[in-house]
Amino acid sequence: MASLVYSPFTLSTSKAEHLSSLTNSTKHSFLRKKHRSTKPAKSFFKVKSAVSGNGLFTQTNPEVRRIVPIKRDNVPTVKIVYVVLEAQYQSSLSEAVQSLNKTSRFASYEVVGYLVEELRDKNTYNNFCEDLKDANIFIGSLIFVEELAIKVKDAVEKERDRMDAVLVFPSMPEVMRLNKLGSFSMSQLGQSKSPFFQLFKRKKQGSAGFADSMLKLVRTLPKVLKYLPSDKAQDARLYILSLQFWLGGSPDNLQNFVKMISGSYVPALKGVKIEYSDPVLFLDTGIWHPLAPTMYDDVKEYWNWYDTRRDTNDSLKRKDATVVGLVLQRSHIVTGDDSHYVAVIMELEARGAKVVPIFAGGLDFSGPVEKYFVDPVSKQPIVNSAVSLTGFALVGGPARQDHPRAIEALKKLDVPYLVAVPLVFQTTEEWLNSTLGLHPIQVALQVALPELDGAMEPIVFAGRDPRTGKSHALHKRVEQLCIRAIRWGELKRKTKAEKKLAITVFSFPPDKGNVGTAAYLNVFASIFSVLRDLKRDGYNVEGLPENAETLIEEIIHDKEAQFSSPNLNVAYKMGVREYQDLTPYANALEENWGKPPGNLNSDGENLLVYGKAYGNVFIGVQPTFGYEGDPMRLLFSKSASPHHGFAAYYSYVEKIFKADAVLHFGTHGSLEFMPGKQVGMSDACFPDSLIGNIPNVYYYAANNPSEATIAKRRSYANTISYLTPPAENAGLYKGLKQLSELISSYQSLKDTGRGPQIVSSIISTAKQCNLDKDVDLPDEGLELSPKDRDSVVGKVYSKIMEIESRLLPCGLHVIGEPPSAMEAVATLVNIAALDRPEDEISALPSILAECVGREIEDVYRGSDKGILSDVELLKEITDASRGAVSAFVEKTTNSKGQVVDVSDKLTSLLGFGINEPWVEYLSNTKFYRANRDKLRTVFGFLGECLKLVVMDNELGSLMQALEGKYVEPGPGGDPIRNPKVLPTGKNIHALDPQAIPTTAAMASAKIVVERLVERQKLENEGKYPETIALVLWGTDNIKTYGESLGQVLWMIGVRPIADTFGRVNRVEPVSLEELGRPRIDVVVNCSGVFRDLFINQMNLLDRAIKMVAELDEPVEQNFVRKHALEQAEALGIDIREAATRVFSNASGSYSANISLAVENSSWNDEKQLQDMYLSRKSFAFDSDAPGAGMAEKKQVFEMALSTAEVTFQNLDSSEISLTDVSHYFDSDPTNLVQSLRKDKKKPSSYIADTTTANAQVRTLSETVRLDARTKLLNPKWYEGMMSSGYEGVREIEKRLSNTVGWSATSGQVDNWVYEEANSTFIQDEEMLNRLMNTNPNSFRKMLQTFLEANGRGYWDTSAENIEKLKELYSQVEDKIEGIDR
C-alpha cells in the first residue's frame, strides 16, 4: 500500500533526496521555507477507515482542523470557525495560525475547521453548530451544494448578529448573504442597484463568470468603492482586501488576513494596533513550473527558460519531443500544497515529455488554455495532449458549468483532453479500501461533469494525507497517467504509415456464429469500411481482402494461417513463461483459474490469441468473460477475475503487436465490466491492468450512453457514437394485413346489411392471429347490435394499428453509411410526433388534430378504448403526418434515394404558400386548415434535424481520435426524444447525474404511475398495490432525464427539489391529500450501470424511502411504513434498516447472470435462476453510510420482495424492446416474487411503454406478444436482418433465445409464439436453407433453443416438429464439421 504513495517517507532514500532537492529548489519568494522531515511517519496508514464506520469522510486529525490557543495572561482568545471545500486552505490556514500563535502578543487564536462535505454527517454538523456558539469570526468558501449551503446558512444565521465578523467567499447566494463586516452587509444580496451588488446577480448566469467577476472586482477596487455609501466604504474595502488575501492563499497572506479582520472587528482587540502587510498578489493566470524562478505570463518567456535548463535529459532536448499541457489550480500552488503537481511534472519529464503547466485563479480555465496552449499566430496547438489535474470541469469548477464555452476552447486546441482526479473528499486509505472507488460526490463533480467537456481517463493520481489534509502523489497512478498522456500525445506526433492499430471485436456467447457481436451494427461490413478508409488515408493495411465476406472468413478460418485451429484463426501462440513475463498481474488470476495456460483460449500448452493482421492493423477477437459455461461460479467467487487467455490477449496487443491504439468495435465487450472499483480504479483493478498503456477508442451505439460511460471510466475509452438503424413502422403482414382489409370493408359496407357477416369474419381472423389474447372477442358477430359491432371492430382495429405503427429498427447499421431518404422520413415522423414546449414546437399530430376541433390526447384515449371513430381519426392523422414529412424529404432526395443538399433546399422551402411541400400535401386531406405558422415552426425544426440525421462523421471522428485530435463530445440517448444526439461520431457522454429527474420527467412519471396503479386496481378488485418491485436502468434514465427515477419517487409520494443550479439533492413528502392515494412501497433493483452512474440518486432514493417510513401516518395510508415496521419487528432491526429498498449488485459486479445461464443452457431448474438473482442482487445502498459501498442485506431484500403484488419495468425507446436484449429478463423477479410470497400468488407484471407520445401500460404478456408480432414473426424485420447476412441470422437467433429467457423468469410467453416462430423459420424450407447456409453456427443455436423450449415445458408442439428439429440439428452439426475440416 505504501508504494502507492509518492511522498518522502515512502520512497527510497535516493528518490526522497531527489524530491527533497527538487522541492528546495522550487521555493518562490512568496512561499516561506518549510522543513521536510525525512523521518518515517508513524502509523501513516493506521487512521481508522471511514468505510468501516459510517462511510462518510474521515476528518483530518485535530492538529490540522482544530488549533488550540496558547493560554497567556491578559491575552484575549479569538475563535475562528471556517467551512471550505478545498483541503489546501485548511492546511495553509492552520500553518498560518500556528505560526501566529507562537509570535502574537496581542491575541491567542483558536481555529476550528470543517470541509463542507463533512457536514453531511449528523454528529459533525452538531459539533459545527456548537463551535459557532462562541465563535468570533466565521469564514466560508466555495459552498455550492444546496443542501449543505442550507445547513451552513441555518447554523451561521443563528449566531450572525452576535459574531464580530462573517466572511463568505464565492458560494451560493443564500450563504453569501451572511457576509457582514461592521456596517457592510450582504443580507440584501442581489436586491440593490449598485454595481457591487449587481455583480452577485451574475451568479445565476454561471459560477465561473461569477468567480472571474470577483477577481475583476478585486483589480478594479477604486472604481467600485466610489459607488458605495461613505459609511460602508471602509468596511467594503476590508472585505475586498479579505478576498485578495484569501485568493492569495499562502500562509503569509492568510496570517495577515487573520490579523486584519480580528484587529478591525473583534471588540477585545479594539485599541490594539495590529500591524499587517498588504496582500501579496499573484498572476490570475500563468505558467508555473516547480524549478522555474518565477511564474510566467508569456509562453515565449517560459520556453526561453525551459530551453536553457541544465537539469534536463537528452529526450527533453529533442525538437520532436512530445509536449503535454497541464491545467492546475492556482490555490494549490499559492498554498504550497503542490507536491502532487510536482510529481506529475517530474514523471512526464523523466519519460521524455516536455511540460507546459498552466494555472488560473478563478473557475474558468478556457482562457488560459487558449492563451498558453495555442500558438497565437498559426492557431496550432503547442502541446500534443492536455491533462487537467484539477479534477473539475474546465469552466465552472464545482459550481455551475459552462460546457459550450469549454468545448469551444478545446475544439480550438484540438488535442486529446484528459482530466485526472485528485482525492478531495476521501483520504488515500478510504479510496484504497472502498469497493466504490471514488465517493459519490467526487464521481458527480470530478468525473461526470468533466465528461460533458469531452474529458477522458479519470485516473486517480493524488491522495490526501489524513494527518495534514495535504495532497500527495500516488506513484503508480502518476506513472499510469503520465504514460497514457504521452501515448495519446504520440498519436498527434507519429505518421499514419507507422501507427499500429488493434481492432478488437467481440464474440458473445462464444461461438463461431457470434464473432463480431455488437448492438445494431454490421461489424464486418463496418470494419471493412474503416480499413478501406484507413488505407486511403495513408495507413498500412497490407493484404486487405476485396470484400467484407472474405474478411469474415479470414478472421474465422484463414486457410493460410501459420497455426491450424478448430476454433478461430490463431494469430499468435504465447508460451506460459512469455505470458507471465508480459503480464505482471498473472498471479492474481490463479485463485480463480489455476496455473496458466488453463483451458480457455488455450491448446493446453500455449495461450492462443485469435485474429489476423493486415499490415499495421490487427483484427483480434476479444476472449469472452470466462463464466459463460458456468455462471453459478460467480455465486461463490468473491474475487472474480479475467482468465489467463483474456489477459494474454491484451498483453499481446500492447507488448508484442505494440499497438499505438486499440479500437473496440461496437457495443459491447467485457473489458469495461471486469472486476474492480466502480470509478477511480487502482492498479489492482482488472480493467486498468488489462488496458495497460494503450489509448483506447471505442465505437459505441449512440442510444447506449450508460454503458458507453462505463467504458469511458473503467477502460479509459474515447467513446465514438454510431447510429442505430433508423426506426420504421412495423407494418402488417399475413392475417394482420387481411384483418386491416376486412376492417376497411366494414367501414365502407357496415350500413348495407353486410356488416354482421364482415364482423364475424373479423372475429374469426382475429382469433387465427391470436388477438383474442389481447381483445375480448365474442364467438361471432351476427347477433351483435350495430353499437356492439362498432365496439368489437374498434378494439381489433386499435390493436392492429398498435402493431402497424410500432417502431422498429430494420437491418443493421454500417459505419460511414448515411441513411436513405425513407429512413430519414421514418425518423423525422417520429421526431415530429413529440411536443417540445421548451422550444415552443407543437407536435405535428397535435397540430393536425387541432384543425379538426380535437385535442390529440382525447384522440389517443378514444383510440385506446377502441372507439372506432377515434381509431380511424388517429389513422388519418398518422398517415397525414407521414405524407407531409415524405413530401418535405422528397424535395431533398436524389435519384439514388439519398438525402443531399439539405441546406440549399431548406432555404428555398421555408418560404410561404404553395412552395411549402407539406402545405401542398395537406391541402388534399381533411387537415387543409392546419395552422401554417405552427407547421412552419415544426418543419423548420425537422429541417435542422434532417441535416443532423444524414450527416456522417463516424469515420471522420475515428480518424481524428487516431491522429491525436479532440473528438467533440455529445449526449447519448434516443435521437427521437433528443435530436442533439445527432450527428453521430461524437465522444458520447451521459449527463449530470444530479440533474435528474427533471420537471418534465416528473410530469411524465406521474402519468405512468397513475395509469399503472389504476390498471392494477382494475384487475385486483379495486385494491391499491401495497408493493411494486421495479427496475432502474442507466440508459433509460439518461434518455428520459430520470422518468423511471421519478416514478419511484411518485409511488412513495415525494417530490424532488432542485437547487439554484438545477441539481436534485433533496426531496419533500407530498401530503396524502394531494397524493390522493396511499404511499406505495417499492423494491428497487438498480442495474449495475445505474449504480455506477447514478449513485447520488440512489442516495436520494434511499433517503426518500426512509423519510417516508418515518412519517407519522396511518399504516393503511403508508405501505412503506407498514412493511418497514413489520420487517423491523420480524428481523429485530431498527425501522431505517428495515426500510432498505434500494438494491443492486455488489460494487464492481453487473447483472444477475441469469442471461448467461439461459444463453448457455447451463441451468437445471427455475429455482436455480432465482437463487442466482437473490445472491447477485441483494446488495443494498445505505444513505446513512454513502461511502461504504454496497452491503449484502439478503434477509431484508427477500422480506421486501415477499410483499410485492406488482413487478414493473419501462421501455423508453423504439430501438430496444423486451426481446432485443437479455437485460430485461435478467432483471425480472416475477417468478421469484411468487416463490417468496406466503400465498404463492404470481404478481401482476406490467411494462410501461413511453416510446411514443401516447404512453401505455401493458401487461408483460401483452408486451411479449406485441414484440413477437412486430419483430420475430414480422417479415419486414427478419428480412431486414437477413439482408445483413451472417450477422443478421445471429440477431434472429438472439430474439428467440431472449424469448425463452422470459419463459424462464416470468412464464409469460404464449405457446403460439413458439409455434409461429417454428412455422416461420423451420417449416419454411427456403427460409431454413437460407439460415443454415448464411450462418450455420447461429442456426444450430436456434435449433437448440427450440428443443430447449420444448424440453423445459415452455412450448407444447407436435412430435413431428420435434423430430424435424433433431434431424436438422444433426445435419447442421455435420455441415459445421465439414466446414471445419
From Swiss-Prot:
Catalytic activity line of the entry: protoporphyrin IX + Mg(2+) + ATP + H2O = Mg-protoporphyrin IX + ADP + phosphate + 3 H(+)
UniProt superkingdom: Eukaryota
EC number from the UniProt entry: 6.6.1.1
Bilayer topology annotation: Peripheral membrane protein
One Pfam short name: DUF3479
GO cellular component, one term: chloroplast stroma
Residue list for modification N-acetylalanine: A50
Signal peptide: none
Pathway this chain belongs to: Porphyrin-containing compound metabolism; chlorophyll biosynthesis
Span of chain positions assigned to the transit peptide in the UniProt entry: 1-49
Keyword NADP (UniProt): no
Additional note from the record: Plants silencing CHLH show significant ABA-insensitive phenotypes in seed germination, post-germination growth arrest by ABA and ABA-induced promotion of stomatal closure and inhibition of stomatal opening. In contrast, plants over-expressing ABAR display ABA-hypersensitive phenotypes.
Homology family: Belongs to the Mg-chelatase subunit H family.
Purpose of the protein: Multifunctional protein involved in chlorophyll synthesis, plastid-to-nucleus retrograde signaling and abscisic acid (ABA) perception. In chlorophyll synthesis, catalyzes the insertion of magnesium ion into protoporphyrin IX to yield Mg-protoporphyrin IX. The reaction takes place in two steps, with an ATP-dependent activation followed by an ATP-dependent chelation step. In addition to its function in the Mg-chelatase enzyme, is required for the plastid-to-nucleus retrograde signaling.
Full protein name: Magnesium-chelatase subunit ChlH, chloroplastic
